Amino acid sequence: MPLGLKPTCSMCKTTSSSMWKKSPQGEILCHHCTGRGGGGAGVAGGTGGGGGGGGGFGTTTFATTSAGPSQSNGGGGGKQSKQEIHRRSARLRNTKYKSAPAAEKKVSTKGKGRRHIFKLKNPIKAPESVSTIVTAESIFYKGVYYQIGDVVSVIDEQDGKPYYAQIRGFIQDQYCEKSAALTWLIPTLASPRDQFDPASYIIGPEEDLPRKMEYLEFVCHAPSEYFKSRSSPFPTVPTRPEKGYIWTHVGPTPAITIKETVANHL
C-alpha cells in the first residue's frame, strides 16, 4: 500500500483500526471485520438466497455485520442472521480420578521430646567479632619473662644485621597474639659491633606500629640509670656503704662465701 493513503475497510467502510489485513480475494479488512470469518462470502450467499424468492432461509449464514442495515433483494425477506459466534473454552475436568482427601493430622498426647528442649523458637544470630586489645606491663612468651624496658634485637631482612630496641609496652589481641611497642636505640662510635653495650647507646625515635613477639629476640633486662650501671650485680668488695638497694640474681646465693670474703677484706 502506498505511503500517505489511508486504508478503508471494504465491509464497514471504516478508516481507523488497530490492525489491517488483506483477505484472499484482495480486499482490505479492518481488525473487527477480520474476525467474522468469511464476511464477503456470507454477504453474497445471503443476496442469492433472497433473490430465490419466497423468503427462504436455505442459505443462512452466521456472519455478523458491525454497521449498516441487512441487504435484501427481490420480494422476499431473506434476512441475515445476526447471531454472533462466541467461542468459549471449557475446561475439561476428569472427575473419574479424584484426589484423595488429606489425612487428618494426629494429635500426639505424649509429652515433648528431649530435642524440643534445645530448640529455640526465635534463633538469634551470633554477633560479629570485634577486635579487642589488652595492654600489659609484662608478658610471658616462649619461656622468657618480658617487662617494660627490656632490650630486644630485631634482624633486618636486607642486610641481616641486628638492630636493638627497648620495649615500651605490650599488646595482646583477641586471638592471644602478643606484640610489643618499641623504642629504637641508636648506636654511637663507642658501640661494639659484635655485642650490645647499654652504656654506648642512646634512646632514639619511638615506633608507632607494634611488632609481633616472634620477630623479637631477648637481649637483656632494663639497665639501671639510663643504660649505665653504677654498681656491679656480682658480689664484690663494697667501697662504700650501700643502703636501701640490694642486688640479687636468679638461683641459689652463696651467702656464707660472700660474708667470709667481705670479712677478710675488712
From Swiss-Prot:
Q: Which GO terms describe its cellular component?
A: nucleoplasm; nucleus
InterPro entries in the record, alphabetically? GATAD1, Znf_GATA, Znf_NHR/GATA
Crosslink site: Glycyl lysine isopeptide (Lys-Gly) (interchain with G-Cter in SUMO2): K259
Q: Which GO terms describe its molecular function?
A: sequence-specific DNA binding; zinc ion binding
Q: Where are the zinc fingers (GATA-type)?
A: 9-33
Subcellular location field: Nucleus
The annotated region (Disordered) lies at 59-112
Gene3D superfamilies named in the record: Erythroid Transcription Factor GATA-1, subunit A
Question: Which keywords label this protein?
Answer: Isopeptide bond, Metal-binding, Nucleus, Ubl conjugation, Zinc, Zinc-finger
Gene Ontology annotations of biological process type: chromatin remodeling; regulation of DNA-templated transcription
The Low complexity compositionally biased stretches are 59-72
Q: In which tissues is it expressed?
A: Expressed in the eye (lens, ciliary body, retina, sclera and conjunctiva) at postnatal day 2 and 10. Not detected anywhere at postnatal day 14.
Source species, domain of life: Eukaryota
Quaternary data = Component of a chromatin complex, at least composed of KDM5A, GATAD1 and EMSY.
Described function = Component of some chromatin complex recruited to chromatin sites methylated 'Lys-4' of histone H3 (H3K4me), with a preference for trimethylated form (H3K4me3).
Q: Tell me what this protein is called.
A: GATA zinc finger domain-containing protein 1
What species is given as this protein's source? Mus musculus (Mouse)
Taxonomic lineage: Eukaryota, Metazoa, Chordata, Craniata, Vertebrata
The encoding gene: Gatad1
